[in-house]
A protein has these predicted regions:
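C-terminal functional modules
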Residues: 1-113
Length: 113
């Protein structure tokens, strides 16, 4: 659905929340990591779907959920990295888990629709 700028007291709570979060996302846009985190946290704004998805376990609808660990972690910190990956697998809300871009982190609970 198209979200207008004007706040509407007769609209549903979720519609008004979407309006507020969309404006917040626009305000955060110059700080890409913050706007991306806000989108992952809330599911708003509704973004255009990905046309070509070459991501490993990344949902076309939900998009990238987290950054993967850098290669240096695998070579220089493998013990702690494996412990962290096991936590990701155990606590993932989407049952994908592991060190992939599609793994939901602990605070990423609202699914993007």
């Amino acid at each position: 659905p198209t979200i207008t700028i004007k706040f509407d007291n007769s609209a549903t709570f979720e519609t008004n929340l979407e309006r507020i979060i969309t404006q917040k996302w626009i305000a955060l846009f110059p700080n890409g990591i913050e706007s991306w985190s806000e989108h992952r946290r809330t599911g708003y704004p509704k973004l255009l779907p990905v046309v070509v998805n070459k991501g490993r376990n990344v949902s076309t609808e939900a998009g990238m959920r987290r950054l993967m660990y850098p290669n240096e972690e695998y070579t220089q910190n493998s013990f702690h990295l494996n412990n962290a990956i096991n936590v990701l697998i155990k606590e993932s809300s989407n049952n994908q888990g592991g060190d992939t871009g599609g793994t939901h982190v602990w605070w990423d609970r609202k699914a993007n629709e």
